[in-house]
Amino acid sequence: LRKRPMCLACLLLLLGMLLFSSGASDKDADRKISGNDSVSVEGQVYKREEKANSLQIYLKNISIIQPGQTGSQNTSQPENAENYGAMLEKSNLLIRLDKNQNKIKIGTYVRAAGILKEPEKATNPGQFDFARYYAAKGIYYILDDARTLAVSGSYDLILETLCSLRETLAKKFDEIGGEDAGFLQAMLLGEKSNLEEEMKDLYQLGGISHILAISGLHISLLGMALYKWLRKHGTGFLCAGLISGLLMAAYCVMTGFGVSAKRALLMYLVYLGAQIFGRTYDLLSGLAFSAVVILTGSPELLGDVSFLLSFLAILGLGTLQPLIASIFHVNNKIILGILSGAAIQIITVPVSLWFFYETSLFGLVLNLIVLPLLPLVLAFGAAGAAVGFISIKAGIICFAPCHYLLKLYELLCRLAASLPGSRIVLGQPEIWQLFVYYGLIAGLFLGARIYGRFTDSSRVPGCLGGAAFLAALGTVLVLDTSSGLRITFLDVGQGDGICIQSDTGKVYFIDGGSSSEKSVGKYRIIPFLKYYGISYLDGLILTHGDEDHINGARELIEGKEGIGIGCLILPDVSTDDEIYRELESLAKERRIPVQYLNSGMSIQEKDGLSLVCLHPAAGYKASSRNGESSVIMLSYGSFRALFTGDLEEAEERMLLRQQAFSRVDVLKAAHHGSKNSTTDEFLQVTRPEAAVISCGEGNRYGHPHKELLLRLGEAGCRSYLTKDLGAVQVVTDGDRYTLSCGARPSGRM
């Protein structure tokens, strides 16, 4: 560190940020808004993006327009407009306008009216946190359904020119690229909105999704090629450095200036400075310098996935790869290339798991093929766009090699996806696992300093030791120290989704659907499962056929995200309901066995977990789907929980007459907290201590009804509403239980 003062400065900065981060974690506590209020605002445009269905502009220097000001006619402000103004002063603002809105130039001042919202916060474990994502960009509010009131002031010529160039190039890729346009727009322009979701997922599964972002790799390839070309053609060090530095800075700004691009640009500028002043470029010092600059300006990026992966990848190249090469006397360029990929993979896997919960076994192999070909993809893509300004046909011809290379990428990803082990779902590691993992890597460096390189006679034992070291790293990440039973009532909006996990690895999922959240399986259920390292459900139990209980489960059955299902369990009722036939057919296509659940049947696990069906009786015919709902009693030691689906009052009273119910600890209140279910008589028999009500914010049914909440309170039962608290999680050892809520419940086992 004495030879690298910038590395020491970076280390001290990181230490200081970690020490003071706890005190700053609640900085946004004063940014809460009471609801979705209509407001009028003014600010300066610093960024513009054209999306498929909207025009998005980003404002800074925000202020609330008071009634009576120019441009505020026909608009009203909320009573607490002054408070909003104070909050917005600390925030940038994203405004979503109609797609047909006239272009608003960067640098101008805009007055707009719309609905002020907070970005969606994660309410379930594993769910993507839009609030945190936008906070890393300095954005704490979004103005939705907006309309412009006035545009004034001069625009920023440089930024507007770069943004217009980006939009023009994007349209040119559409003209020459056809189905491949989205790839080049992502790779060269940083615009991912036109990339098909299926292809994004495919590249991620193959472990090569990093090439779809403007990353350090792109800046390095383009910047180094430009600088070397200028030097080769007689340009001096200073002139070549200034030209290439300015052009790469302009390119980074044009493509959105993401954190990875910032890191690469800063390191590139350090490299150019070394060239100009005749100094030796040090990779780690350049990395540390870029970290200090970025974190000083935006300390919230310390927890950003792009920041962490970008810096760790270069750290792996600058430390782990040369260490391994030195220990084993590796000089072969091909082997060094493999070591580079392996070093990046080893050092970034824990962070990838922290954010994405899964990894790819074949990412390293695919990258060995994909990365050497990437310069050709970028070159032919850029050439096609450039020639396309002269002739579309000629541009298409120039673009052709790029098309076939992208097809090769797709073929490789599909091949990898078809192989066993293509998707390893390990879940989010715990903090102690991260410390142990990186502690072992630090121990490797310490051991290398003490013992040095292997001699020829010690290479075989050294290789065996290396294999043992990798096995130790893997063991740390897969180690599971959980115990007991975990029940999670997911926040799926207006719907139901319940996960039951035992410490022996058995997992059952009850229902899974929503009438208020789109693609609830993809965005809430599947991320939750992956967060806990769940890639297989022993049973998927659907209580009845309403869409708010099955549409997310249908996504699971379709199997696009690699979640295996041991058995689909449907209610054993007398009905010709088409929805059950559809589910049976879909399960048959996926080779998933289907079983039918009726009263008296049970699932018994060796660890003591028991699921007993109380309703419906075999062949039961109800007046509605809700009346068909499977009612399940869970037992684990002395702990009891009751799941009631959308059971209606008539069936509830019928089961009371049959004396089917007994005392429970936790109740899943029927039908999202409807007025007539969960009667006084039912509560007197079951006497639950806690009732979980799964319902959506502002739902049109008025769930949960005040009458129900009153009944629960009078019965001495605490109510937990997912719309207010997020996911509700119960963890029990079979005797006592703890209950916690939110995206990071304290009851993690």
Predicted regions and their residues:
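Cap/insert and terminal regions of metallo-dependent hydrolase folds
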Residues: 567-569, 652-726
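Membrane-interface amphipathic/re-entrant loop segments adjacent to transmembrane helices
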Residues: 150-160, 205, 353-369, 381-438, ...
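Transmembrane alpha-helices and immediately adjacent membrane-cytoplasm interface residues
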Residues: 4-30, 473-478
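Metallo-beta-lactamase
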Residues: 537-548, 573, 667-671
